[in-house]
């Protein structure tokens, strides 16, 4: 009996544990994991592009715009007052002059800064020639349609910018109200336009760029501004178009116009 028990115990001690079956790695499983990883990376990129990146790009655009304004202010300092003004005199009227028309800029060449009080006190987006993404819209901000008028010139001064991504300069274009100031600053001074109306068109509606928007073969007698961007948000199926009319040109020697500091009602 004891030998029998010993024999069984010896057999039990020499037994090896069964090896667990190896998990087979299937091709479908690998593909699934790769797709999940790619999806996470894509999601992170979208979050960066639409939110985090926009905040960074927007701040950079405004900083560059303010730097341009400051550099022009240093080049054209305001004249020093020779005497204190007489309190009995009526306040001075805003100083305006005949607009100084710039030459059309080359693709990607900066020429101005756009200020829109409705969009905030710090809104100061650089403007450059051309409307290509690679040269102007992505790296700079607002682009001028080649062949259209320049600021203050009779006809249609037409510009474009992103509504989403890359700092989204025209993100709030639909918030404009009748009478809102749209101020274009150049080294010569400030061109003030007043917003009039919005329109939604198809992407091929190039008539909005005519000297008189939407009017073929009509000679211009007014100075317009036309701002275009994609619509609806995150889509390119339509274009949103904002129109404005010219109000005044303020030479740099006269100081910034009051329109720049208007409170958005």
Q: Model regions: which residues?
A:
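Solvent-exposed, non-transmembrane regions of membrane-associated and secreted proteins
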Residues: 23-24, 29-30, 37-265
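Terminal targeting segments of Actinobacterial cell-envelope proteins
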Residues: 1-28, 78
């Amino acid at each position: 009996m004891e030998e029998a028990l010993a024999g069984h115990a010896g057999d039990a001690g020499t037994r090896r544990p069964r090896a667990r079956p190896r998990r087979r790695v299937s091709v479908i499983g690998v593909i699934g994991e790769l797709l999940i990883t790619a999806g996470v990376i894509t999601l992170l990129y979208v979050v960066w592009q639409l939110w985090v990146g926009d905040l960074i790009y927007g701040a950079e655009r405004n900083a560059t715009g303010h730097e341009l304004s400051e550099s022009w202010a240093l080049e054209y300092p305001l004249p020093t007052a020779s005497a204190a003004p007489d309190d009995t005199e009526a306040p001075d009227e805003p100083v305006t002059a005949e607009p100084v028309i710039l030459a059309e800029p080359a693709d990607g060449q900066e020429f101005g800064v756009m200020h829109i009080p409705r969009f905030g006190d710090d809104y100061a987006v650089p403007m450059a020639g051309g409307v290509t993404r690679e040269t102007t819209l992505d790296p700079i901000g607002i682009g001028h349609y080649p062949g259209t008028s320049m600021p203050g010139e009779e006809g249609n001064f037409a510009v474009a910018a992103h509504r989403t991504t890359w700092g989204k300069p025209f993100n709030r274009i639909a918030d404009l109200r009748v009478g809102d100031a749209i101020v274009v600053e150049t080294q010569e001074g400030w061109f003030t336009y007043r917003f009039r109306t919005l329109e939604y068109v198809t992407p091929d509606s190039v008539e909005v760029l005519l000297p008189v928007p939407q009017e073929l073969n009509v000679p211009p007698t007014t100075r317009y501004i036309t701002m275009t961007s994609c619509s609806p948000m995150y889509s390119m199926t339509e274009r949103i178009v904002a129109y404005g009319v010219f109000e005044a040109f303020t030479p740099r020697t006269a100081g910034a116009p009051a329109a720049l500091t208007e409170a958005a009602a």
